[in-house]
């Protein structure tokens, strides 16, 4: 009886031009295999089993065997029975019945055949049956198994654990366990398939029970009475695989697939392409767990994972955890409930990324899951010392009342927009958080980058960041509001945590007074205001006779304002006046303002485009607002007593004294910042800083646009120099993470406000013409660009000027954008210049000609006459002597020089010996290089083979 290790398939050999037999696991020519491992062959027969169980011998316990026709009966009279078998196969027409004293009785069957076990017929048991064969076990198509509980394993059970709650299985069996049939356990029963490689391609059912697929060399099953409650892989071998391509149903119960031990450094894979259902049944929620090694394991999530509650009750729980977890775009993951609460899906790998391509899950797949499931993405550094970051690089949106939780031991980086419109939809962001048994990094943070915004527009959405619950603001509020639930109403709780759930139109403030949030030192804002990338538009604050004026009047040391933009703001006051804050002792980051700031009184002090008086920290922020004031007037800050870093101002600035393009009076620190706006004043004016009693480092102003040749601090540059990366790079500016610049077009721009845009050059293929190539074939954008994309596309790279056949790089360029536009990422294309057509004739055919009138070859052949390195012929030469062409050999290039406009080759055969390229030259112009491998065979070959 041949084993499955000896099953072969026929594939075409391109080397031998024939069909050859290869092992079943061998790959044909085609795409390389991915990370998913192929199922190893089970060492059992592919043919029909030839016999029922034979050679049964009772080792312990009491029982007997009998056979009548095609039915074998094992009658068990003790609670535990151990049998040894010489062979245990069930043919398609055969039945094996285990008659046991109770549902809790166990019959252990150790099989000592030299091949694997085949179950192709019927196996029935009212109790629990263990089949153990180190050479493998196959439940073939058509197999029907009905048991109270079953273990099919290539690992042997340790006898002393058999009666306890934890049962250990160990062994060196090399076979696999594969199910292609139907295995059904009684309600509350279980099915466990154990071995180094385990696969279900059939159907397994265990309602209210458990299905466990474990791949490893040591496995522990844990029981509560007769119920299987846990599977743990204790030891691994290389390339352990647990796979499901069929159907597993355990409604109201548990499904667990695990490969490799948790801390093993050996590769292991859990792969689901089939359907796994553990839906709520009789108010019992189901659980599905796909678990790979947390050091080197891989879980591939495809197909369907369904722990929903379609018929009542709450949804269940799904976990997919390993060092690496990859979710297919078409995977269906749900814990939805029609009449109860949605369940949860936990994804727990290292360094997880949401991306349209090249990541671990796409935004579309995550959005689909959130339609009915609470999703928790969890990232840790792991044993390989990854970053521990969780990155959202693709748009995520959902309308259900579900919650997305983002937890990382280091940073949570949101680089693409997240939108939740459900009335009670939620978002939880936990950076710097211990998870998966790993401590927090201690430095992790939440970062909103790349122009991304987080929208929570429902009636009562939820938001938590770093353990703090935020009130989500989606409305302006009435004048004088203190509700604590709208923008104006923040005055009702100045120490709270607030977030903008959407953009707010504040046009109504043009006709009603807006009271600054935290109106003075006695009542400062001491909480956190998280803009989530949103804007407040058309805000008017008219406090002509007041000081400490801005959206926030006075910000305390503990106050934090970040990720917000003020668009079209109109602010008026007498002193300590700014669009975002009048006075700030707190931290302001990733924020900006456009509009006008007007210090109306002649004696107004500290007027700035973003902040009037800064005693705290301003990072990664800018202002384009026009600013007018009296003493201490600056494009970004009027009076700086704290720190300004990685910031800039471009608006015009007009004041009386201490007037600067960035800062009016500096008493603190300014670094890595610049100004380009025009500056005018009566006394003490500067292009960057008006008065300086602090320090100014690596900061610049535009001497042309500011109309100022001097400044109390900083370095003056021309407009051309301001638009060149070189000087800023020498000053230590970070163009990899903080800044970008479009050389010759813009001054430095802050990356955090810009949306990545991939611009890809299209490939080009042209036939050889002897003329240099120029230009390109257009570009493709990763998103629909708008008016923010400026410039004209240009092309560079080795393609420009290319003549000879070959592949050349097309490098696009020429586009640029402003601050709220695009961070352009170019992807090159390829120019392929193909050789002019060359006909290599292996049998009589129509004459081929060389047409030098167009400096190209319509069809031709390369030849060399015997004894010479080249051939020049007279008028209209015709070569009909095939043997002459057998001399096309030699270590260097051979050349054929036709002497007229037409040279015909008839019935030619080419010998492909030699090493150099063969050249065709016409009138001194090199027309083509023909590889010596271009000869075509006389007989056809399969289409899957490469042309030779």
Regions found by a protein language model. Give the residues of each.
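Hydrophobic beta-strand positions
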Residues: 11-12, 131
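Residue-level recognition of short loop/turn positions
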Residues: 15-16, 208, 533, 821
